[in-house]
Amino acid sequence: MTVATATRPLTALGAVLDAFERCASVRAVADRLPARGEVLRLGGLPGSSGAVLAGWLAGRLGAGRLVVVVATTPSDAERWLGDLQQLVGDGVALYPQREGLAEEEPHYEIAGERIETLEALLRGDLRVLVTTARASAERTAVPEALEALRFRIAVGEAYRITRVLGTL
């Protein structure tokens, strides 16, 4: 039976992370974990074992630390996201690339997902961020600009229809 801890939530595959931690080679990686601001690059893991490692790291590093997975393609990023959501549960998000669309013609679903991911990142809600190299290189609005783009509607408040339509 898998038990939720402060660093590892109860998920369907949480037992996989528990078993993973008992491997000798994983303990060797644990001894090499980088200090804040340093980087550790690992590769060569087949199938979903990379996601198991990333999920284990997210639990091991705990709150305030972020594991970033940079996938080669958008479909690889989606695969990583699905695997990590099953292993880690909440605290995993995808920062998608714009799929080759010009800045002037944004795809609104992708733009919305990017904003939601940035907001979760800034709130400290993420333990694992999945993205692509291309997405990480694309220009993105700074947090103040993201807040300026937000339009909140509350029950009982009056809004000019032109403002609502202009925002939409």
Residue ranges and their predicted role:
Residues 1-168:
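ASCE RecA-like P-loop NTPase motor cores
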